Amino acid sequence: MKFLDFFRANKKPSTASVAKERLQIIVAHERGQRSTPDYLPALQKELVEVIRKYVNIGNDDVHVALENDGSCSILELNITLPDR
C-alpha cells in the first residue's frame, strides 16, 4: 500500500507541519520589524536625564534613531531645545 501512496497526488500536509511553517513565518516577520536594539529606549531615557541637568526639556524633546547601512550603523540624536 505504501508503494501506491507514493503515486497519489492528493497528499495533505500534517497539521503540525503547517503550524510549524506558519510559526516560522510569524517569527521571521517579527524579527524583521524589530530592527531597533533593545537598549535604545533605555539610552533615550538616560540621555533625557543627563540633558535635564542643564536644560529644561520634556521626554518628547529627544528622539533617538539607529540606522543600519550595510556594515555601518548610524546613531541619530535629535534634541529640541527650548527658546531662551
UniProtKB/Swiss-Prot annotation:
HAMAP family: MinE (MF_00262). It comes from the Bacteria. The gene is minE. The keyword Cell division applies. Belongs to the MinE family. This is Cell division topological specificity factor. GO terms for biological process: cell division; regulation of division septum assembly. Prevents the cell division inhibition by proteins MinC and MinD at internal division sites while permitting inhibition at polar sites. This ensures cell division at the proper site by restricting the formation of a division septum at the midpoint of the long axis of the cell. Keywords: Cell cycle, Cell division. It holds the Pfam family MinE. NCBIfam families: minE (TIGR01215), PRK00296.1 (NF001422), PRK13989.1 (NF010595).
